[in-house]
Regions:
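Long, low-complexity segments enriched in small/aliphatic residues
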Residues: 89-217
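Short helix/loop capping segments that flank catalytic or ligand/cofactor-binding pockets
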Residues: 9-10, 26-28, 51, 175-176, ...
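A residue-level signal for beta-strand positions that form part of recognition/binding surfaces
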Residues: 40, 162-164, 171, 196-198, ...
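Short, well-ordered loop/turn elements at secondary-structure boundaries
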Residues: 10-13, 159-161, 167-168, 193-195, ...
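Short, polar loop motifs at secondary-structure junctions
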Residues: 2-8
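A broadly conserved detector of short glycine/acidic/proline-rich loop/turn motifs that flank catalytic sites
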Residues: 5, 21-22, 66, 146, ...
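Long, contiguous, secondary-structure-rich segments that constitute the structural scaffold
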Residues: 45-50, 54-127, 210-228, 232-323
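Flexible glycine/proline-rich, aromatic-decorated loop/lid segments
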Residues: 8-43
Length: 323
């Protein structure tokens, strides 16, 4: 495992390789830029220098991948292969600004960059606002973003449909045959009377992910790992706000503090995911002091969604009684 914590997941690893601080590496937000209300591009250099002898996370990942591939491949060779494959894909994409160019041109333009910075530079050049290897002199590349540390505002969002669609019809296919074929099963399930309670998950602003539970400012204050219950259900079941309740499913049971609230509808109870930090073979002291309960213990491995084949993690049938 590559992690800064010995937690409930990494305890299963034979070796845990420590990851350096995120403040010691460059950053370009790809995921959340897709949620922005304007087109922006921003590159952040490392805020802190890496410790002597410390390897970048990407270097470690490349070394592990090279070992898995075998043949004596080095991390540096694999880095070059990844970059070459990306260059090939970008010049083959008819929508990119480097379409039809030689992959070697794109690789040469990104020199002497390595690792993720090289990949980023090539993607910027090929993207809809890129320099297109000089075809658009005012377009983006990594060097330009480094010269604008506060980022570049590229203007309002632009329509991209149907340009980016890759469906056979060239349209947004909202009713594929597989989905329509599954509708009768869904309708029949909705008509069946619902007996008992259904368990759903939730997130809290200060604990979106489990690693946040090992940071004191994120977990201080009220208990956030509670079982939310509608007042009508609480009265019917004899549950008291602040008192423990036992939640039982076909797979297992947990005990959690009851939170009576009208924020959840009758017939439904809610436990947040990512808690249950009471394992003795971990080293996350702050999280253990705010352990909560592991809602995964209530999920059954047998039921799956027939259409997608994924596990059922919401809408789990449960019973709840005072603990």
């Amino acid at each position: 495992s590559l992690d800064v914590y010995l937690n409930e997941t990494t305890r299963h690893a034979d070796v845990i390789l420590p990851a350096p601080s995120t403040l010691t590496r460059t950053h370009y937000d790809i995921s959340f830029t897709a949620l922005a209300c304007r087109n922006v591009a921003r590159f952040s250099p490392p805020s802190l220098p890496a410790a002597e002898g410390e390897r970048a996370q990407s270097q470690t990942l490349l070394r592990l991948a090279a070992v898995a591939i075998g043949n004596g491949m080095s991390a540096e060779t694999l880095d070059d292969l990844v970059a070459a494959e990306l260059a090939r894909q970008l010049v083959a994409d008819t929508q990119s600004r480097v379409a039809g160019r030689a992959p070697e041109e794109l690789l040469a333009a990104a020199e002497p960059l390595r690792l993720e910075d090289r990949l980023l530079d090539m993607m910027l050049r090929a993207g809809p606002y890129g320099d297109g290897l000089g075809s658009f002199p005012d377009g983006l590349n990594l060097r330009m973003l480094e010269a604008h540390p506060h980022g570049i505002d590229l203007g309002p969002l632009q329509p991209r449909l149907p340009e980016v669609l890759r469906t056979p019809s060239g349209r947004v296919e909202l009713a594929p045959a597989q989905l329509l074929a599954d509708v009768p099963r869904l309708v029949e399930a909705l008509r069946r009377p619902s007996n008992g309670l259904r368990l759903v998950g939730r997130r809290d602003l200060r604990s979106n992910n489990s690693w946040m539970h090992n940071i004191e400012p994120m977990v201080k204050g009220r208990n956030r790992c509670t079982l939310q219950v509608n007042p009508a259900d609480a009265d019917r079941l004899g549950l008291v706000h602040g008192a423990p309740a036992r939640v039982q499913s076909a797979a297992g049971s947990v005990e959690a503090e009851t939170e009576v609230t009208d924020a959840i509808r009758a017939g439904v109870v809610s436990l947040p995911h990512g808690w249950g930090h009471d394992r003795p073979d971990t080293r996350i002291g702050i999280a253990r002091a705010h352990a909560g309960v592991n809602s995964n213990l209530l999920t059954d491995e047998v039921p799956i969604d027939p259409l997608s084949g994924t596990a059922v993690l919401n809408g789990i049938p449960v019973t709840v009684v005072p603990a």
